[in-house]
Amino acid sequence: MKHLTVKALVLQFNDCIQLIDGKNNIDNVITIPGLKRSVFELLGLFCKPIGSVAILGKREFIFLNQKPVEQQKKIIANLLKLKPPAVILTKSFLDCGVLLAVNQTYQVPILKTNLFSTELSFTVETYINEQFATVQKLHGVLLEIFGVGVFLEGKSGIGKSESALDLINKNHLLIGDDAIEIYRLGNRLFGRAQALAKGFMEIRGLGIINIERAYGLQITKEQTEIQLAISLLSLEEKNNASFERLGSDLKLKNLLGVKISYYQIPISSGRKTSEIIESAVIDFKLKKSGYNSANEFILKQRAMLEEQTDE
C-alpha cells in the first residue's frame, strides 16, 4: 500500500510549512490521499481513524471561536482522538493556543502554513495525490512542444530519440527519454522521467548524452501534462494502418483510462519528422481552439464547385 510520511511532506514544503507541535510523531504515515476538511469529526459525528492530513482553516476557526474555551477543547479533542497523521493550520487559522493545549494529550503533529486553503489545494494536496497516483511505465520520449505535453512512441530504432533531439535543438523541452512514468490525477495525465534516466538520452551511434549538461537546464523539465500522443510508424506499419487523407477528426488514444488526442506519422526518407511533429502539435492546438483546416478546405472546395455550377 502506498504511503507518505509527515516528515517527507514537511521536508518537501519546508519553505511554507512549519512543524509547531507533535515532533515525536513526525514519522506518522499518511495512508489516504488528499486533505480532509474535518467539520464532521469536530462535531463528533464520525469516529473512524483518519488516514489523511486534516486541515483547519477559516471556517473551522470561526466555528471554534464562537464557542467557550472549554467547549473548544472538547470539539478539538473530537478530531485529535481520531489520530490523523497530522493537522495542518492554514493562514486563516489565527490562534492555535487552545489546539496546542489539547494536543499535549494526543501529540498529533501540528503543521502551520502561510498559505490559504485554496493555495494548499493547488500545492500540498496535489503533491500528496501524486504520491498515491497509479504509475505506469511506458517506452517512448516525452517532450513539451509549444507548451503541449507530447508522448512520442514507436518501435525501437525507428528514430524517436533522434527526432526528439531535433526538437530540443529547436528549443522544445525534454521531460524524459526511453522509460517514462505516466500517472493519472483526476481526468488528467502527467508524465515524468524515471529518476535514473532524468536528463539523459540514448542516440544510436553516439551513445548516452547528458542533455542537461550539453544544452543547459533550461531545455529540460521535471514533468508535464500529457495532452497528445504521436506514434511514429515504420513502412510495414504504415501499410497496415488506415489514414484519413484530410485529417478532419482527431483520433483518440486511451492511456490509464484517459482519452488523449493521437496522431500517426509514417517515417520515410526525405521527410523531416521533427517538423511534421511540430505541425501535428500546431494542428492539435488549432482544433482545440475550434479551428479545423480540413473543414475550411472542404468549405472552400464546396464553394468553388457551387460557383462553377452557377456558371
Swiss-Prot record:
GO terms for biological process: regulation of carbohydrate metabolic process. Transmembrane segments: none annotated. It is an enzyme of class 2 (transferase). It catalyses: [HPr protein]-L-serine + ATP = [HPr protein]-O-phospho-L-serine + ADP + H(+); [HPr protein]-O-phospho-L-serine + phosphate + H(+) = [HPr protein]-L-serine + diphosphate. The active site is at H139, K160, D178 (proton acceptor), R245. The keyword Oxidoreductase does not apply. The keyword ATP-binding applies. Residues 266-271 are annotated as: Important for the catalytic mechanism of dephosphorylation. InterPro entries: HPr(Ser)_kin/Pase, Hpr_kin/Pase_C, Hpr_kin/Pase_Hpr_N, P-loop_NTPase, Ser_kin/Pase_Hpr-like_N_sf. ATP binds at G154, K155, S156, G157, I158, G159, K160, S161. Homohexamer. Catalyzes the ATP- as well as the pyrophosphate-dependent phosphorylation of a specific serine residue in HPr, a phosphocarrier protein of the phosphoenolpyruvate-dependent sugar phosphotransferase system (PTS). HprK/P also catalyzes the pyrophosphate-producing, inorganic phosphate-dependent dephosphorylation (phosphorolysis) of seryl-phosphorylated HPr (P-Ser-HPr). This is HPr kinase/phosphorylase. The gene is hprK.
